[in-house]
């Protein structure tokens, strides 16, 4: 048997979907000679990265966590979103022993239940249906004091779209006859993932101490005031909701705190501030002794708190299977997507496999990435080219964050520059592979940058899309690409190209047929 080409590089262009419409399509508008040449000369097709094809509800846009899980697992991974929704529908959620344990302990001592989470129908980090269910559960179990600390979205939803969600939760509490929204703050603060602890501190002090930049007598009034200050949902400053005659809510000893985000990466920092005894990223005036702090899912194994829906282990994901066959692999990304190309691609595993190396390139320290649309892509590419030339690795998995992170800003010109930068980077990788006889597969985890304006509202479109994503083979072999592929088919495709048998646990099907 002839040796398979080495290395095989999987290039994941984050947020790089395919749209037939040229309108507000940053990919269409960009000058991209390398991409155009690849599409003209190399086998390519489209694969699905949304909805049931990735284990999400029908019509639900994909996201980076889900995308990388499916890409690495080689099977459709039943997502936490669908697990929690199903548990609510089945009634199991309301008896969840971990949540019930914390709530019951607080109720027995006549203490409060605090619900934290992204209040949004976005379905990427959380879903407001889950927050409604949590409020109902607390009330059913006898909690007299139920407080929602609402983080506002505007990133996986239109920039100013929080009002219906706030009104829905106000109505939920009114219907229960108890509980209320206690505070609102933008996800920019509460859900940082880049160690910008000053942002997290603003959220922590709002929730725990009732310390706010602004106060309002209702959640909707708080939102209207934020809009009047020029803030969109994502950036709403710390606001305590204090109805007439009431005081700002604080978290007290003996209270229960339930964090209702199901996606881990943007829930970790705030969780650590609540539960780590030796936490020192910012000074905490108080660290209440809680009846319980519950993570909806496991945000990190190192966070000392129980989770309501523990991970369901995945065996024989691509990284593990390559290691079993003595293959070497490199994972590389900049900070913003490093967790995706390591933890999520490995099916929720923190530690590297035997023969796996990792390179983390710091993301630029700018307020928003439209200010530096190239991000750290050139530096990432430097290291990939070096790795290809060394021929030390059988497989290289790289994530380029630009399409997604710049797409989220809603700034069209910056998104075009991001695509043009990616094109240059791909050109360098293709050239390096050509020299050593390596191969690449280029795909994406979900769409974003191909739709930069919401036609129905005229607002910037900052969220992901349900568009299919490209799948391009780069190399010298003659092969054909089938239609109807999904992200879960990418790992089996890589095994086909490497001449490795597919493990039974991988239920995806190779997208390529050799010969």
UniProtKB/Swiss-Prot annotation:
Catalytic residues as annotated in Swiss-Prot or TrEMBL: 64
Pfam families attached to this UniProt entry: iPGM_N, Metalloenzyme
Gene Ontology cellular-component terms listed: cytosol
Classification via InterPro entries: Alkaline_phosphatase_core_sf, BPG-indep_PGM_N, Metalloenzyme, PGAM_B_sf, Pgm_bpd_ind
GO MF, one annotated term: phosphoglycerate mutase activity
Keywords, comma-separated and alphabetical: Glycolysis, Isomerase, Manganese, Metal-binding
Keyword Isomerase: yes
Residues that, per the record, bind Mn(2+) 1: 404, 408, 464
Cited SUPFAM superfamilies: 2,3-Bisphosphoglycerate-independent phosphoglycerate mutase, substrate-binding domain, Alkaline phosphatase-like
Involved pathway(s): Carbohydrate degradation; glycolysis; pyruvate from D-glyceraldehyde 3-phosphate: step 3/5
UniProt-listed Enzyme Commission number(s): 5.4.2.12
Residues that bind substrate: 125, 155-156, 187, 193, 263-266, 337
Source superkingdom: Bacteria
Purpose: Catalyzes the interconversion of 2-phosphoglycerate and 3-phosphoglycerate.
Subunit relationships: Monomer.
HAMAP family for this protein: GpmI
Protein name: 2,3-bisphosphoglycerate-independent phosphoglycerate mutase
Organism: Pseudomonas aeruginosa (strain ATCC 15692 / DSM 22644 / CIP 104116 / JCM 14847 / LMG 12228 / 1C / PRS 101 / PAO1)
Gene: gpmI
């Amino acid at each position: 048997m002839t040796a398979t080409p080495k290395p095989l590089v999987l290039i994941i262009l984050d947020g790089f979907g395919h749209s037939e419409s040229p309108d507000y399509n940053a990919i269409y508008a960009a000058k991209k000679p390398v991409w155009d040449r690849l599409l003209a000369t190399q086998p390519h097709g489209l694969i699905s990265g949304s909805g049931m094809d990735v284990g999400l509800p029908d019509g639900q846009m994909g996201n980076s966590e889900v995308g990388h899980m499916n890409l690495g697992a080689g099977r459709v991974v039943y997502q936490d979103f669908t697990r929690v929704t199903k548990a609510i529908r089945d009634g199991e959620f309301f008896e969840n022993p971990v949540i019930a344990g914390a709530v019951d302990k607080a109720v027995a001592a006549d203490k409060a239940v605090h619900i934290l989470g992204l209040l949004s129908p976005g379905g990427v980090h959380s879903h407001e249906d889950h927050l409604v269910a949590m409020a109902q559960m607390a009330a059913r179990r006898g909690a007299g004091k139920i407080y929602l600390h609402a983080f506002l979205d505007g990133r996986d939803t239109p920039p100013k779209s929080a009002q219906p969600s706030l009104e829905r939760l106000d109505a939920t509490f009114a219907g229960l006859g108890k509980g209320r929204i206690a505070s609102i703050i933008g996800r920019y603060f509460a859900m940082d993932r880049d160690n910008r602890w000053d942002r997290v501190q603003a959220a922590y002090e709002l929730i725990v101490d009732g310390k706010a930049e602004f106060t309002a007598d209702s959640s909707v009034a708080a939102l209207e005031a934020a809009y009047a200050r020029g803030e969109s949902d994502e950036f709403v400053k710390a606001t305590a909701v204090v109805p007439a005659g009431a005081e700002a809510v604080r978290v007290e000893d003996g209270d229960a705190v339930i964090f209702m985000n199901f996606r881990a990466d943007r829930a970790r920092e705030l969780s650590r501030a609540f539960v780590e005894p030796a936490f020192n990223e910012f000074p905490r005036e108080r660290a209440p002794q809680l009846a319980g702090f519950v993570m909806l899912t496991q945000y990190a194994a190192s966070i000392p708190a129980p989770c309501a829906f523990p991970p369901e282990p995945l065996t024989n994901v691509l990284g593990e299977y390559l290691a079993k066959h003595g293959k070497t692999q490199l994972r590389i990304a900049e900070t913003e997507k490093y967790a995706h190309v390591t933890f999520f691609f490995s099916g929720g595993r923190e530690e590297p496999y035997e023969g796996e190396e990792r390179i983390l390139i710091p993301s630029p320290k700018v307020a928003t990435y439209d200010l530096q649309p190239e991000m750290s892509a050139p530096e990432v590419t430097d290291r990939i080219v070096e790795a290809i030339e060394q021929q030390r690795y059988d497989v290289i998995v790289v994530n380029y964050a630009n399409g997604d992170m710049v797409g989220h800003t809603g700034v069209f010109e910056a998104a075009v520059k991001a695509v043009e930068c990616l094109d240059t980077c791909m050109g360098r990788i293709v050239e390096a592979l050509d020299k050593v006889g390596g191969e690449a597969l280029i795909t994406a985890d979900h769409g974003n940058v191909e739709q930069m304006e919401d036609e129905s509202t005229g607002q910037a479109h900052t969220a992901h899309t349900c568009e299919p994503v490209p799948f391009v083979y780069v190399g010298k072999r003659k092969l054909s690409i089938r239609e109807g592929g999904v992200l879960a088919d990418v790992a089996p495709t890589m095994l086909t190209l490497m001449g490795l048998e597919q493990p039974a646990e991988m239920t995806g099907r190779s997208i390529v047929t050799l010969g």
